[in-house]
């Protein structure tokens, strides 16, 4: 599938590269998204909320800062997993010197 370049995603800085793994038909109404996401150094995915769904990130490469529900930040790196349940929010910033690549999975409740 085609890689999408999205500017200021969810109010974040710079741009995000989004490579969908499954198309809408394959997601079958059960998932909102399954994609490989790339944040270049200095870019971020802005804080956003999830309602009626949850989202998991699995960090493949790079490092950055993860905004957990707008109340705390934590450092994340390759191999880390984040989970944002229904009714909560999150954001992610690449604070490293290399691309941060992660898998994003949105599961509908």
Specify the residue positions occupied by each region the protein language model found:
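A short, N-terminal "cap"/entry segment at the start of jelly-roll beta-barrel domains
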Residues: 1-32, 46
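Conserved short histidine dyad/triad with adjacent acidic residue
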Residues: 20-23, 35-51, 86
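Histidine-centered metal-chelating micro-motifs
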Residues: 44-46, 65, 82, 86-92
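Short histidine-centered beta-strand/loop micro-motifs
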Residues: 45-51, 68, 74-75, 93-95
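Glycine- and acidic-residue-biased ligand/ion/polar-headgroup-sensing regions
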Residues: 52-54, 58-64
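Short acidic-glycine-tyrosine-enriched beta hairpin
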Residues: 70-86
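Ligand-binding loop in jelly-roll beta-barrel domains
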Residues: 73, 86-109
């Amino acid at each position: 599938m085609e890689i999408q370049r999205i500017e200021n995603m969810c109010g974040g800085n710079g741009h995000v590269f989004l490579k969908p793994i499954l198309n809408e038909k394959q997601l079958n109404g059960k998932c909102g998204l399954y994609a490989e996401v790339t944040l270049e150094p200095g870019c971020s995915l802005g804080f956003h909320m999830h309602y009626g769904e949850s989202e998991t990130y699995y960090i493949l490469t790079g490092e950055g800062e993860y905004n957990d529900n707008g109340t705390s930040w934590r450092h994340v790196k390759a191999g880390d997993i984040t989970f944002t349940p229904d009714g909560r929010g999150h954001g992610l910033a690449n604070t490293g010197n290399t691309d941060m690549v992660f898998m994003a999975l949105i599961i509908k409740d």
